[in-house]
Amino acid sequence: MVGRAIVDRHGLAPEVHPSDFGAVVAAACLAHDIGNPPFGHAGEDAMRAWFASHSAYLAGLDPDQRADLLNYEGNAQGFRILTHLQNPTNPGGLQLTCAVLATFAKYPRRSHLVEPLSGKSARKFGYFQAEAGLFAEVAETVGLIPRAAGAWFRHPLTFLVEAADDTCYLVVDIEDGVQQGCVSPEQAEELLLDLAGGIEAASRLKHLEDPKRRIEYLRARAIGRLVDEAARIFLENEAAILDGSFDHALFDVSPVGESLQKVRKVAEEQIYNARQVMEVMAAGYEVISGLLDGYVDGACGPQTARNRVWANLLPADFDQMAGESNYLRMLQVADMIAGMTDSYAVSAYRRLKGIELPG
Protein backbone atom coordinates (compact mmCIF):
# COMPACT_ATOMS: atom_id res chain seq x y z
CA MET A 1 0.00 0.00 0.00
CA VAL A 2 2.67 2.53 1.06
CA GLY A 3 5.16 1.44 -1.58
CA ARG A 4 2.62 1.66 -4.38
CA ALA A 5 1.48 5.11 -3.25
CA ILE A 6 5.06 6.43 -3.09
CA VAL A 7 5.92 5.07 -6.54
CA ASP A 8 2.77 6.58 -8.04
CA ARG A 9 3.07 9.94 -6.29
CA HIS A 10 6.68 10.48 -7.28
CA GLY A 11 6.71 8.77 -10.67
CA LEU A 12 9.45 6.32 -9.68
CA ALA A 13 8.47 3.37 -11.92
CA PRO A 14 9.90 1.37 -13.58
CA GLU A 15 13.29 1.82 -11.85
CA VAL A 16 11.77 1.37 -8.40
CA HIS A 17 9.26 -1.34 -7.51
CA PRO A 18 6.69 -0.81 -4.73
CA SER A 19 8.01 -3.89 -2.92
CA ASP A 20 11.44 -2.25 -2.59
CA PHE A 21 10.09 -0.01 0.15
CA GLY A 22 8.66 -2.97 2.02
CA ALA A 23 11.97 -4.82 1.73
CA VAL A 24 13.88 -1.90 3.25
CA VAL A 25 11.42 -1.55 6.14
CA ALA A 26 11.36 -5.32 6.75
CA ALA A 27 15.17 -5.51 6.88
CA ALA A 28 15.36 -2.59 9.30
CA CYS A 29 12.62 -4.13 11.47
CA LEU A 30 14.46 -7.44 11.58
CA ALA A 31 17.61 -5.69 12.79
CA HIS A 32 16.04 -3.08 15.07
CA ASP A 33 16.88 -4.73 18.43
CA ILE A 34 20.15 -6.36 17.40
CA GLY A 35 22.18 -4.02 19.62
CA ASN A 36 20.30 -4.71 22.85
CA PRO A 37 22.60 -6.09 25.57
CA PRO A 38 21.50 -8.94 27.85
CA PHE A 39 18.43 -8.01 29.92
CA GLY A 40 17.37 -5.34 27.42
CA HIS A 41 16.83 -1.85 28.81
CA ALA A 42 17.96 -3.00 32.26
CA GLY A 43 21.23 -4.07 30.67
CA GLU A 44 21.63 -0.65 29.06
CA ASP A 45 20.97 1.04 32.41
CA ALA A 46 23.49 -1.23 34.13
CA MET A 47 26.19 -0.36 31.62
CA ARG A 48 25.53 3.38 31.96
CA ALA A 49 25.61 3.13 35.74
CA TRP A 50 28.87 1.18 35.68
CA PHE A 51 30.69 3.72 33.52
CA ALA A 52 29.30 6.58 35.65
CA SER A 53 30.73 4.98 38.79
CA HIS A 54 34.15 4.28 37.22
CA SER A 55 35.13 7.76 36.10
CA ALA A 56 38.85 6.98 36.27
CA TYR A 57 38.49 4.96 33.08
CA LEU A 58 36.90 7.95 31.34
CA ALA A 59 39.82 10.28 32.06
CA GLY A 60 41.42 11.50 28.85
CA LEU A 61 38.36 10.78 26.70
CA ASP A 62 36.87 13.64 24.71
CA PRO A 63 33.28 14.80 25.49
CA ASP A 64 31.78 12.74 22.65
CA GLN A 65 33.52 9.56 23.76
CA ARG A 66 32.54 10.09 27.39
CA ALA A 67 28.92 10.68 26.38
CA ASP A 68 28.93 7.46 24.34
CA LEU A 69 29.76 5.41 27.43
CA LEU A 70 27.87 7.37 30.09
CA ASN A 71 24.72 7.23 27.94
CA TYR A 72 25.39 3.77 26.49
CA GLU A 73 22.70 3.08 23.90
CA GLY A 74 21.60 -0.18 22.29
CA ASN A 75 20.57 1.64 19.12
CA ALA A 76 24.14 2.85 18.61
CA GLN A 77 25.43 -0.63 19.44
CA GLY A 78 23.11 -1.98 16.75
CA PHE A 79 24.53 0.35 14.10
CA ARG A 80 28.03 -0.73 15.16
CA ILE A 81 27.13 -4.41 14.89
CA LEU A 82 25.55 -4.05 11.45
CA THR A 83 28.38 -1.98 9.98
CA HIS A 84 31.40 -3.51 11.66
CA LEU A 85 31.10 -6.40 14.07
CA GLN A 86 29.23 -8.88 11.90
CA ASN A 87 32.25 -9.03 9.58
CA PRO A 88 35.07 -7.04 11.20
CA THR A 89 37.65 -7.80 8.52
CA ASN A 90 35.41 -6.47 5.75
CA PRO A 91 34.61 -2.72 5.72
CA GLY A 92 30.84 -2.27 5.96
CA GLY A 93 30.16 -5.28 8.17
CA LEU A 94 26.98 -7.01 7.08
CA GLN A 95 27.01 -5.07 3.77
CA LEU A 96 23.51 -3.69 4.14
CA THR A 97 22.43 -0.89 1.84
CA CYS A 98 22.60 2.71 3.01
CA ALA A 99 18.80 2.83 2.72
CA VAL A 100 18.44 -0.01 5.24
CA LEU A 101 21.04 1.45 7.61
CA ALA A 102 19.42 4.90 7.52
CA THR A 103 15.96 3.40 8.05
CA PHE A 104 17.33 1.38 10.98
CA ALA A 105 18.55 4.58 12.69
CA LYS A 106 15.59 5.72 14.81
CA TYR A 107 17.75 8.37 16.49
CA PRO A 108 20.10 9.83 13.86
CA ARG A 109 22.32 11.90 16.10
CA ARG A 110 25.53 11.65 18.10
CA SER A 111 25.51 11.26 21.88
CA HIS A 112 26.95 14.66 22.82
CA LEU A 113 25.04 17.71 21.63
CA VAL A 114 26.12 21.27 22.31
CA GLU A 115 22.49 22.41 22.16
CA PRO A 116 19.61 20.03 22.98
CA LEU A 117 17.25 19.04 20.17
CA SER A 118 13.50 18.52 20.48
CA GLY A 119 11.32 15.84 18.91
CA LYS A 120 10.96 12.08 19.00
CA SER A 121 14.02 11.39 16.86
CA ALA A 122 16.35 13.24 19.26
CA ARG A 123 15.37 11.43 22.48
CA LYS A 124 18.34 9.07 22.22
CA PHE A 125 21.39 8.73 20.00
CA GLY A 126 22.06 6.35 17.15
CA TYR A 127 25.80 5.91 16.68
CA PHE A 128 29.04 5.94 18.64
CA GLN A 129 31.90 8.29 17.75
CA ALA A 130 33.82 5.25 16.52
CA GLU A 131 31.28 5.04 13.66
CA ALA A 132 30.70 8.79 13.20
CA GLY A 133 32.35 8.91 9.78
CA LEU A 134 30.40 5.93 8.52
CA PHE A 135 27.09 7.31 9.80
CA ALA A 136 27.78 10.64 8.09
CA GLU A 137 28.49 8.76 4.85
CA VAL A 138 25.18 6.88 5.14
CA ALA A 139 23.30 10.12 5.85
CA GLU A 140 24.85 11.89 2.87
CA THR A 141 24.26 8.96 0.54
CA VAL A 142 20.52 8.74 1.23
CA GLY A 143 20.02 12.50 1.62
CA LEU A 144 19.10 12.81 5.29
CA ILE A 145 18.42 16.46 6.14
CA PRO A 146 21.12 17.92 8.44
CA ARG A 147 19.76 19.25 11.71
CA ALA A 148 22.86 20.15 13.75
CA ALA A 149 26.48 19.05 13.91
CA GLY A 150 26.32 15.25 14.02
CA ALA A 151 22.51 15.17 13.84
CA TRP A 152 19.96 14.68 11.07
CA PHE A 153 16.22 14.33 10.62
CA ARG A 154 15.00 10.76 10.28
CA HIS A 155 14.80 8.76 7.11
CA PRO A 156 11.07 8.76 6.22
CA LEU A 157 10.75 4.98 6.35
CA THR A 158 12.02 4.96 9.94
CA PHE A 159 8.58 6.10 11.06
CA LEU A 160 7.14 2.83 9.72
CA VAL A 161 9.79 0.80 11.56
CA GLU A 162 8.92 2.60 14.78
CA ALA A 163 5.20 1.97 14.21
CA ALA A 164 5.87 -1.73 13.60
CA ASP A 165 7.86 -1.92 16.83
CA ASP A 166 5.12 -0.19 18.84
CA THR A 167 2.47 -2.40 17.26
CA CYS A 168 4.18 -5.67 18.04
CA TYR A 169 5.60 -5.11 21.46
CA LEU A 170 2.55 -3.42 22.97
CA VAL A 171 0.01 -5.89 21.60
CA VAL A 172 2.10 -9.01 22.16
CA ASP A 173 3.16 -7.87 25.64
CA ILE A 174 -0.51 -7.81 26.68
CA GLU A 175 -0.92 -11.37 25.40
CA ASP A 176 2.25 -12.40 27.27
CA GLY A 177 0.93 -10.64 30.36
CA VAL A 178 -2.12 -12.91 30.33
CA GLN A 179 0.08 -16.01 30.10
CA GLN A 180 2.21 -14.78 33.01
CA GLY A 181 -0.82 -13.97 35.16
CA CYS A 182 -0.09 -10.23 35.24
CA VAL A 183 -3.18 -9.28 33.21
CA SER A 184 -6.59 -10.94 33.44
CA PRO A 185 -8.10 -12.35 30.22
CA GLU A 186 -11.06 -10.00 30.66
CA GLN A 187 -8.84 -6.93 30.94
CA ALA A 188 -6.77 -8.02 27.94
CA GLU A 189 -9.91 -8.55 25.86
CA GLU A 190 -11.18 -5.09 26.71
CA LEU A 191 -7.88 -3.45 25.75
CA LEU A 192 -7.40 -5.43 22.54
CA LEU A 193 -11.04 -5.10 21.48
CA ASP A 194 -10.65 -1.33 21.65
CA LEU A 195 -7.59 -1.57 19.39
CA ALA A 196 -9.18 -4.12 17.08
CA GLY A 197 -12.03 -1.86 16.06
CA GLY A 198 -14.88 -2.60 18.40
CA ILE A 199 -18.18 -3.75 16.88
CA GLU A 200 -16.97 -5.94 14.00
CA ALA A 201 -14.36 -7.67 16.13
CA ALA A 202 -16.88 -8.16 18.95
CA SER A 203 -19.37 -9.90 16.65
CA ARG A 204 -16.81 -12.53 15.67
CA LEU A 205 -15.66 -12.88 19.26
CA LYS A 206 -19.09 -14.16 20.30
CA HIS A 207 -18.39 -17.38 18.41
CA LEU A 208 -15.14 -18.09 20.27
CA GLU A 209 -15.32 -19.65 23.72
CA ASP A 210 -11.73 -20.64 24.46
CA PRO A 211 -10.02 -17.70 26.27
CA LYS A 212 -6.70 -18.36 24.55
CA ARG A 213 -8.26 -18.31 21.09
CA ARG A 214 -10.20 -15.16 21.91
CA ILE A 215 -6.99 -13.33 22.84
CA GLU A 216 -5.20 -14.66 19.75
CA TYR A 217 -8.02 -13.47 17.52
CA LEU A 218 -8.08 -10.00 19.07
CA ARG A 219 -4.29 -9.77 18.85
CA ALA A 220 -4.41 -10.51 15.11
CA ARG A 221 -7.24 -8.03 14.54
CA ALA A 222 -5.50 -5.32 16.57
CA ILE A 223 -2.24 -5.73 14.67
CA GLY A 224 -4.10 -5.65 11.36
CA ARG A 225 -5.85 -2.42 12.26
CA LEU A 226 -2.64 -0.79 13.49
CA VAL A 227 -0.81 -1.71 10.29
CA ASP A 228 -3.54 -0.08 8.21
CA GLU A 229 -3.58 2.97 10.46
CA ALA A 230 0.20 3.41 10.31
CA ALA A 231 0.09 3.34 6.51
CA ARG A 232 -2.74 5.87 6.43
CA ILE A 233 -1.06 8.33 8.81
CA PHE A 234 2.27 7.99 6.98
CA LEU A 235 0.76 8.80 3.60
CA GLU A 236 -1.32 11.67 4.97
CA ASN A 237 1.78 13.25 6.49
CA GLU A 238 4.32 12.30 3.82
CA ALA A 239 5.18 15.89 2.85
CA ALA A 240 5.87 16.90 6.46
CA ILE A 241 7.86 13.71 7.03
CA LEU A 242 9.99 14.41 3.97
CA ASP A 243 10.86 17.97 4.99
CA GLY A 244 11.59 17.06 8.63
CA SER A 245 8.73 19.02 10.21
CA PHE A 246 6.93 15.83 11.32
CA ASP A 247 8.78 14.39 14.32
CA HIS A 248 6.30 12.32 16.32
CA ALA A 249 5.39 8.66 16.39
CA LEU A 250 2.77 7.98 13.70
CA PHE A 251 0.26 6.78 16.27
CA ASP A 252 0.58 10.03 18.24
CA VAL A 253 -1.58 11.73 15.59
CA SER A 254 -3.94 8.79 15.08
CA PRO A 255 -7.36 8.04 16.61
CA VAL A 256 -5.86 4.79 17.95
CA GLY A 257 -3.28 6.73 19.95
CA GLU A 258 -5.49 6.96 23.04
CA SER A 259 -6.18 3.21 22.96
CA LEU A 260 -2.46 2.50 22.65
CA GLN A 261 -1.76 4.74 25.63
CA LYS A 262 -4.18 2.65 27.71
CA VAL A 263 -2.34 -0.51 26.64
CA ARG A 264 1.02 1.09 27.44
CA LYS A 265 -0.17 2.17 30.89
CA VAL A 266 -1.36 -1.33 31.77
CA ALA A 267 1.87 -2.85 30.44
CA GLU A 268 4.02 -0.49 32.51
CA GLU A 269 2.01 -0.88 35.71
CA GLN A 270 1.16 -4.59 35.62
CA ILE A 271 3.75 -6.29 33.40
CA TYR A 272 7.03 -4.38 33.35
CA ASN A 273 6.87 -3.75 37.11
CA ALA A 274 5.73 -7.26 38.05
CA ARG A 275 7.89 -8.93 40.70
CA GLN A 276 9.28 -11.60 38.38
CA VAL A 277 10.33 -8.92 35.89
CA MET A 278 11.97 -6.85 38.65
CA GLU A 279 13.88 -9.91 39.85
CA VAL A 280 15.27 -10.47 36.36
CA MET A 281 16.22 -6.80 36.10
CA ALA A 282 17.96 -6.91 39.48
CA ALA A 283 19.90 -9.97 38.38
CA GLY A 284 20.77 -8.17 35.15
CA TYR A 285 22.34 -5.27 37.02
CA GLU A 286 24.53 -7.65 39.03
CA VAL A 287 25.55 -9.76 36.05
CA ILE A 288 26.37 -6.86 33.71
CA SER A 289 28.23 -4.95 36.43
CA GLY A 290 30.20 -8.04 37.41
CA LEU A 291 31.28 -8.76 33.85
CA LEU A 292 32.29 -5.14 33.27
CA ASP A 293 34.27 -5.17 36.53
CA GLY A 294 36.46 -7.97 35.27
CA TYR A 295 36.68 -7.35 31.55
CA VAL A 296 37.29 -3.59 31.69
CA ASP A 297 39.90 -4.05 34.40
CA GLY A 298 41.56 -6.64 32.19
CA ALA A 299 41.38 -4.42 29.11
CA CYS A 300 42.24 -1.03 30.61
CA GLY A 301 43.36 -1.47 34.22
CA PRO A 302 46.80 -1.70 35.81
CA GLN A 303 48.76 -4.87 35.18
CA THR A 304 47.96 -6.69 38.42
CA ALA A 305 47.90 -10.47 38.62
CA ARG A 306 44.09 -10.43 38.73
CA ASN A 307 43.76 -8.10 35.77
CA ARG A 308 46.18 -10.17 33.69
CA VAL A 309 43.92 -13.20 34.20
CA TRP A 310 40.91 -11.22 32.97
CA ALA A 311 42.97 -9.85 30.07
CA ASN A 312 43.74 -13.42 29.01
CA LEU A 313 40.00 -14.10 28.82
CA LEU A 314 39.54 -11.41 26.17
CA PRO A 315 39.36 -12.48 22.50
CA ALA A 316 42.69 -13.23 20.83
CA ASP A 317 42.34 -10.31 18.41
CA PHE A 318 41.30 -7.81 21.09
CA ASP A 319 44.56 -5.83 21.16
CA GLN A 320 44.81 -5.77 17.38
CA MET A 321 41.27 -4.41 17.01
CA ALA A 322 41.18 -1.98 19.94
CA GLY A 323 44.78 -0.74 19.99
CA GLU A 324 45.87 1.56 22.80
CA SER A 325 42.71 3.69 23.00
CA ASN A 326 40.83 3.13 26.25
CA TYR A 327 37.68 4.36 24.50
CA LEU A 328 37.93 1.70 21.81
CA ARG A 329 38.95 -0.95 24.34
CA MET A 330 35.88 -0.24 26.47
CA LEU A 331 33.67 -0.27 23.37
CA GLN A 332 35.19 -3.65 22.53
CA VAL A 333 34.25 -4.94 25.97
CA ALA A 334 30.73 -3.58 25.46
CA ASP A 335 30.66 -5.41 22.12
CA MET A 336 31.44 -8.69 23.87
CA ILE A 337 28.75 -8.25 26.50
CA ALA A 338 26.14 -6.94 24.05
CA GLY A 339 26.63 -10.09 21.99
CA MET A 340 25.65 -12.36 24.89
CA THR A 341 22.19 -13.77 25.52
CA ASP A 342 20.69 -13.44 29.00
CA SER A 343 21.44 -17.07 29.85
CA TYR A 344 24.99 -16.97 28.49
CA ALA A 345 25.74 -13.79 30.46
CA VAL A 346 24.46 -15.41 33.67
CA SER A 347 26.50 -18.55 32.99
CA ALA A 348 29.65 -16.52 32.27
CA TYR A 349 29.11 -14.44 35.41
CA ARG A 350 28.72 -17.55 37.59
CA ARG A 351 31.89 -19.13 36.19
CA LEU A 352 34.05 -16.01 36.22
CA LYS A 353 32.95 -14.95 39.70
CA GLY A 354 33.68 -18.39 41.17
CA ILE A 355 30.06 -19.23 41.95
CA GLU A 356 30.51 -22.38 39.90
CA LEU A 357 33.60 -23.82 38.25
CA PRO A 358 33.92 -24.72 34.56
CA GLY A 359 33.64 -28.36 33.59
Predicted regions and their residues:
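C-terminal structured interaction module
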Residues: 308-309, 332-359
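Composition- and surface-driven signal marking solvent-exposed, interaction-prone regions
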Residues: 173-186, 242-246, 301-307, 349-353
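Sequence-structural signature of the catalytic-core scaffold of metal-dependent phosphohydrolases
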Residues: 1-27, 34-218
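Surface-exposed helix-capping loop/turn segments at secondary-structure junctions
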Residues: 5-13, 297-304, 355
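A residue-level signal for conserved active-site and pocket-lining positions in enzyme catalytic cores
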Residues: 78, 288, 337
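Charged/polar positions within long, soluble alpha-helices
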Residues: 4, 83, 169-172, 176, ...
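C-terminal subdomains that position terminal phosphate/3'-OH groups for nucleotidyl transfer/ligation
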Residues: 197-328, 340, 358
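Conserved acidic
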Residues: 70, 280, 329-336
